[in-house]
Amino acid sequence: MLGKSTLLSILANQISASSGTIKWNKTPLTGRDHSLQAIYLMSEQNLFNKENRLKKIMKDTALLQGAFNQTLADKMLADFELNPKQKINQLSTGYRTIFKTIVALCVPADYVFLDEPILGLDANHRVLLYRYILEAYENRPRTFVLSTHIIEEIANLIEHVLILDQSRIIIDDDLETVLDHSYQISGPKEDVLAYCQELPILASEQIGTLYTNYLYTNYLYTELPADRVIPDRVAIKHVDLQTIFIKLTEKGREQHV
C-alpha cells in the first residue's frame, strides 16, 4: 500500500516506483540531474552523516544544491537555540527535525517537500516553525508540500489540499473550495435524516438526542440544494479542515455517544 512518505520519496527520486512512471515536465524523473535540485525532500529519515557537525552539513548542502540561504539558517539556528558546532547525532528527535527543516527552507529548490516537519516538536517550537515556513515562502514564493497528521495547525498555511486514503487520492482541490463544500448538519434525528435524503453523507454521529450528518457536497453538487426547506430544529454550518479530513477517511461509520 502506497503511503504519503513513500509517495514523497518517489516524487523526490529517492526511491523507485514498483510500477508506473513519475514525469518531470513530461520527461521520466528517474536519473534527471536537474530534478535533484528542483525538488528537495525533508523526511523522518536522516540522510546526513551522523558524525558531521551542523555547519558542515549546511556547507555541503550549499555545494550540492548550488546555493543556500545562510542568513535565514543562522537566524533560525539562533531562534531555536541550536549550536552549529553540534553533531547531528547529538540532537534529540525534535531538534533533529528542526535542523532538517531549516536546511529544507534554505535550499533553492522550487519544490520543497516537508514530511512530518513537526515530529517531536513542542507547541512553541511548532508555532515558530510555521512562522518560518511562511517567511521562507514570502521571501521567495515556491511550492511547499506539507505532509502531517496535525491538520488543524497547518490549515492557515496551505492553499491546496490533497488527501490520500488507502493509496487513493480522494481530495485534490483548493482549500477554499474544500471548506466551502464541507458541512455539518445537526438536530433531531428524524429532521436531519429527512433533510439529508439523497445528499452525499460521509459520516454520522449521535450525542444524546443531537444527531449530526457530515457532508462533502463536491462529490455530487456544487452546494446544498437551494430549494430544500431547512427544518426549524436543524442547524447547518461549515466545518474545519481537520473535521472533514477525519470524516472523509472514516466515511460510512456511524458513531453514538
Predicted ranges, named:
Residues 123-125:
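Helix N-cap at the start of a conserved alpha-helix in ABC-type nucleotide-binding domains
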Residues 20-35:
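Conserved ABC transporter NBD signature motif
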Residues 172-173:
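ABC ATPase "signature
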Residues 12:
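Helix-to-loop junction immediately C-terminal to a conserved catalytic motif
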Residues 203, 207-257:
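C-terminal coupling/interaction segments
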Residues 112-116, 121:
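Catalytic Walker B motif of ABC-type/P-loop ATPase nucleotide-binding domains
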Residues 41-100:
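ABC-family P-loop ATPase nucleotide-binding domains
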